[in-house]
Regions:
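Rossmann-fold NAD(P) dinucleotide-binding segment
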Residues: 93-97, 101-142
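Hydrophobic Val/Ile/Leu positions in short beta-strands of Rossmann-like dinucleotide-binding domains
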Residues: 59-60, 104, 172
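Rossmann-fold dinucleotide-binding core
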Residues: 134-192
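Phosphate-coordination loops involved in phosphoryl transfer and adenosine-cofactor binding
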Residues: 51-56, 98, 125, 167
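N-terminal Rossmann-fold NAD(P) dinucleotide-binding loop
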Residues: 67-68
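N-terminal hydrophobic or amphipathic helices and topogenic motifs
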Residues: 1-56, 63, 72-80
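Residues in the short beta-alpha loop(s) of Rossmann-like NAD(P)-binding domains
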Residues: 63, 86-88, 132
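Adenosine-cofactor binding site in Rossmann-like domains, unifying the SAM/SAH pocket
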Residues: 81-94
Length: 193
């Protein structure tokens, strides 16, 4: 609760000044403690039901920066993970054809090409999503190159260096969802932070 944290920081800063200490130093120390506490709470995760979490998720570009973040996110929620990347034996198409959820986590300049490659091979009823900062072209490509799938574009408002998703924001653009994937994804994201 950010209001309680703010009040705590103000109180500790005030007490530090009363003791002749620099309030900003004490506040900085308490910010680190509060961050560590939030991070630990996020690592415990909110309870996500097995029905919600038991999916096979293919991370296309899973060995890259954002791919690793997505792998951690979905694996911590007890999903089965398939990773395809330049250095894996499984191909993008093989991974996509086996998955309930296909996450495109490749560099921006490769996103459209990869969507064109895997979109036609996604299972009917599956979710095709991306984690690209641009939304218009990837969402349009996912719509055009996949049939019978739900299409959700996401834009994580953070980079691959984050330690946890606690307090992070992700913009979601749900273009097509006839299978309840938007609720599933939102549940997973809230459960992780």
């Amino acid at each position: 609760d950010f209001v309680r944290e703010r009040d705590l920081l103000e109180d500790r800063g005030f007490r530090a000044e009363q003791m002749g200490l620099r309030s900003e130093v004490i506040e900085s120390l308490f910010r680190v403690i509060l961050w560590a506490s939030r991070d630990h709470q996020a690592s415990l995760g909110a309870e996500v039901s097995k029905e919600t979490a038991s999916k096979t998720v293919a991370i296309i570009g899973g060995n890259g920066g954002m791919g690793k973040v997505m792998t951690r996110l979905f694996s911590e929620a007890d999903n089965n993970i398939i990773i395809s990347d330049l250095d894996t034996t499984i191909t993008n198409v093989e991974a996509a054809s086996q998955a309930d959820v296909v996450v495109i986590a490749v560099p921006i300049e490769k996103t459209i090409d990869v969507i064109q490659e895997v979109g036609p091979h996604c299972k009917a009823g599956s979710l095709l999503m991306d984690v690209t900062s641009t939304k218009s072209a990837p969402v349009k490509a996912m719509r055009d190159y996949s049939k019978g799938t739900s299409v959700i574009g996401t834009h994580p408002l953070f980079g691959p260096s984050v330690h946890s998703l606690q307090g992070q924001r992700i913009a979601i653009v749900c273009l097509r969802d006839e299978h309840g994937w938007d609720e599933w994804l939102t549940t997973i994201l809230h459960g992780r932070g």
